[in-house]
Amino acid sequence: MSTQLASNIYAPLYAPFFGFAGCAAAMVLSCLGAAIGTAKSGIGIAGIGTFKPELIMKSLIPVVMSGILAIYGLVVAVLIAGNLSPTEDYTLFNGFMHLSCGLCVGFACLSSGYAIGMVGDVGVRKYMHQPRLFVGIVLILIFSEVLGLYGMIVALILNTRGSE
């Protein structure tokens, strides 16, 4: 094996695969969570739109909150991609760390999107019958959204460990 292709034990040639997998996991899973939240909430909005069209604008809050989840994944994916380079040694530690960053934010946003979708769908339908539920629904949506934010915070903390 030539000296050019030889790698040290801490930076094997396959290590960047894990970084790319983390980048992909961050985007795919967080966008999947955003899509689930948007679709489930959108079903409820479409359901009330036929009865009370004036409530549609106030009912878009779950859809907007679901879209923010994809931004969390995008931020982490961009940070991971910024650390990937074909010319520098990429350690196995960094590869696993970036994979865990992507999975952390991805699964957190996936679960958050599912929660937002469920609360958004049922909440919008019940809001049509009882407008006083609006504040409670928004609070539950905020607590559902913060699950994805927790995943992003942990991913950012993990990402800073690799660049030390």
Swiss-Prot record:
Question: Which of UniProt's keywords are assigned here?
Answer: Hydrogen ion transport, Ion transport, Membrane, Transmembrane, Transmembrane helix, Transport, Vacuole
Q: What does this protein do?
A: Proton-conducting pore forming subunit of the V0 complex of vacuolar(H+)-ATPase (V-ATPase), a multisubunit enzyme composed of a peripheral complex (V1) that hydrolyzes ATP and a membrane integral complex (V0) that translocates protons. V-ATPase is responsible for acidifying and maintaining the pH of intracellular compartments.
Site note Essential for proton translocation applies to 145
Q: Subunit notes for this chain?
A: V-ATPase is a heteromultimeric enzyme composed of a peripheral catalytic V1 complex (components A to H) attached to an integral membrane V0 proton pore complex (components: a, c, c', c'', d, e, f and VOA1). The decameric c-ring forms the proton-conducting pore, and is composed of eight proteolipid subunits c, one subunit c' and one subunit c''.
Lineage of source species:
Eukaryota, Fungi, Dikarya, Ascomycota, Saccharomycotina
Where is the chain membrane-spanning?
15-37, 60-80, 99-120, 133-158
Membrane topology note: Multi-pass membrane protein
Which terms does the UniProt entry file under GO BP?
endosomal lumen acidification; Golgi lumen acidification; proton transmembrane transport; vacuolar acidification
Q: Any one cellular component term from GO for this entry? A: vacuolar proton-transporting V-type ATPase complex
Q: Name one matching Pfam family.
A: ATP-synt_C
Its principal location? membrane
Task: Identify the residue ranges that face the Cytoplasmic compartment according to the record.
Answer: 38-59, 121-132
Q: What else is known?
A: Present with 538 molecules/cell in log phase SD medium.
GO molecular function of the protein, one example? proton-transporting ATPase activity, rotational mechanism
State the similarity comment. Answer: Belongs to the V-ATPase proteolipid subunit family.
Where does this one sit in the cell? Vacuole membrane
Q: What is this protein called?
A: V-type proton ATPase subunit c'
The record places the following residue ranges in the Vacuolar compartment, namely 1-14, 81-98, 159-164
